[in-house]
Amino acid sequence: KSIFLIIGMFLLLSIVLIGLLSYSSPIYEFNYSGDNNNYMTVGKAMMHGFVPYKDVFEQKGPFVYLLYGLASLISFHTFLGSAIFEIAILFAILWLTFKIGKLFSSTKVAFVIALFAPVFVLMEPYYSYGATVEFFLYPAMLSLIYVSLKAQQHQFIISKWTWYFQGCLVGIVF
């Protein structure tokens, strides 16, 4: 029962923080980030059949463009889709930080530790008012840290599915 309360609080915190701190939020009239506008443009082009690096070019990897392309399907003229993805990413950061904390402490202590995660991932210049590529990669890195620490506690026995999932996350990062 308390885990659902924690999940709800993490989700609410994610919505509030992204709503206030991200230019992708509907409360901002325009997203002033040049990078985010570039990613959205390439993502929209992909959704219309253009081939990245051939028909349109920007220097980031295809995962970023796919993410923004999917965001454009949610809302073509705004960054609402991007804001929804940012909320999901911040929630994942909070949850994974909580899970890491639970490996070494009580639920209450892990919860408090997780509440500090946004302080570090949403600060300038790393967050830069939303949707930086680095921000989207935090869950992949935290997942690897969690799996490594948990494996250490269990004689380094890791399931094939966990290896596969971590491999997919590494593929996204690189």
Can you annotate each of these PLM segments?
Residues 62, 66, 76-92:
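Loop-to-helix entry region of an early transmembrane alpha helix in multi-pass inner-membrane enzymes
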Residues 1-21, 160-161:
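Start-transfer (signal-anchor) and selected internal transmembrane alpha helices
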Residues 84-104, 143:
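Transmembrane-helix motifs of polytopic, lipid-linked glycan transferases
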Residues 65, 79, 93, 114-137, ...:
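Aromatic- and kink-enriched transmembrane "portal" helix at the membrane-lumen/periplasm boundary
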Residues 20-58, 70-74:
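Extracytoplasmic loop-helix module adjacent to an early transmembrane segment
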Residues 142-165:
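Membrane-interface transmembrane helices that cradle and orient dolichyl/undecaprenyl
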Residues 97-120, 138-139, 155-158:
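Transmembrane-helix signature of polytopic, membrane-embedded enzymes
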Residues 168-174:
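Transmembrane helices and adjacent periplasmic/lumenal helix-loop junctions
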